[in-house]
Amino acid sequence: MNSLSEKEINGQLFYLSKEAVKTIVLNSRCGLVSQIKKYNKLYSSIDITTNSNFSPLLCVYRKASPTFIHSKNSNGFDEDSFKKEINPATNALMSLCLLELEDYYRKFKDIDNTIFSINTLYKSLSKDQLDFYSKNLRNREGVFVDKKNVLENNLKNFSLVDKDKKFKFSDQSFMMIAYYLYSIKNPDDDISHSYKEFSLQILKMFCDFKDEIYNCSLDEICKVILSLNIFYDYNNNSDAIDLIADLTDYIIGKFDEKDYYIDSLDTTCLFCIVLTLSYKHTKIMIFSEKSTEVINRLYTLYDEDKGSFYKLSSKKEIKYSCFDITFYILAFIVYQNNILFSNEYKILISTLYKKFIINSGLITSWPDAPTLDDYERYRGLSLKSADMVEETYFRMPNIPSPTNTGIAPIFNKSINYNKRKDSFSNSKVTFDSYKNFFNFFLYIYLFKEEYMKELNLIESDTSITSDKHNSDNNDSNELNTDSISNTTKEDENSSTKPNSISNNDNTSNNSPLIEDIEAILFETKNDLNETNNSTDIL
């Protein structure tokens, strides 16, 4: 197999993420499903009043089997396999995917109404999701926490209870981005100002309780810093950049306290990604120097002759988590593009991508490329043969499609690699929503602009970047602590009210975000480290 260019790799990962998000969010039923009929005018490509596949998610559950079950009444993932826990970060990442993809689908206006209608659908659905989160995924003190649905019927009725009293700063940080991104993607929406204020209120919480973040695990702090870097990419907020600088400086010392290369390869790779992004935004040299040190150490794990990288283990069979693989490859891509500005690691990236992502079984299936009569297949959406994009920009030919396998295109939770046999295996195919939406969002966020430029969709169009770098340095000084509670009144007459689904747990609807966070921190301080010490929050 010939070497793939980084442009092809990035294009394939963006395309996979775009299509996988659409499949999971609209067809899996793996979560609480919004009212379907209200989307009838928004999604014109199918008759959703009779199509049993269409099931837009208000929230996504923690785990499920990704195999589609077909019955007379409904199609989707097997409901018996659902682990009906609802994690805030996972759901924020799901909404962020929809919001980022609005830019792509908006380009089809007046060209292909079927594809363009997805833009309108995602805008409406993401609004419904964010409204649902603020009303149902917070505890009595107003902090986002893990919830569990204790009722069997997930389509018509639900009852959410707190999974436990613990909370994660990373859950709050990804929610912060989601509410802010909606506000700048949809500035004319009446609710956008309240969402923006709510987001900045979460940022203020991080400033006020920065010392408590220091008590968290390295993995948890890295996720908070990642969120802050993404947030800063949308808003050059002075509080955000100060937090990025302080927390990144802190984790450099924390990283050196033990050998994370042995214990937590995924955390080490995430640490490297975070260092690179923090350097990109702050230009603090120690961040670049430490990132270079880590990337050089990660490179020593790579065996060029066998085209593999090995976790530091004496075992003949090595278990790789999904994040071990995706973060390892992404660390080199991000470092190469933001510090080296060269293709020094081109061979490593291409080799490991083909072996560990394409050929290992890590991906269950891969969406078919756009057909030859599809506007998405052509640069400038022209349908001209001279503008046709090669299939390798969307997928590799040797990986089965969802149509062939009956399985949604997802990342498996983990795979095993036998060093002696140089072969992969996995015992069970499982959809882990956190791992998947984390990967999907990173690929969409990092590669969307490059993908759209390759298709000549933003050649002279600045709309995709106009949302970013909106300097609101003074926003964090004037916060409305009732901003989210006001959303119920402001949106009372909206035709897209997710609370129209019966809800038996509305105790947090009117809670300001940080009403009593001091009490929460005191109550959970003894187990906060225990909560965050796991690199897998699920």
Describe the residue ranges of each PLM region.
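Glycan-recognition and catalytic cores of secretory/periplasmic carbohydrate-active enzymes
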Residues: 1-538
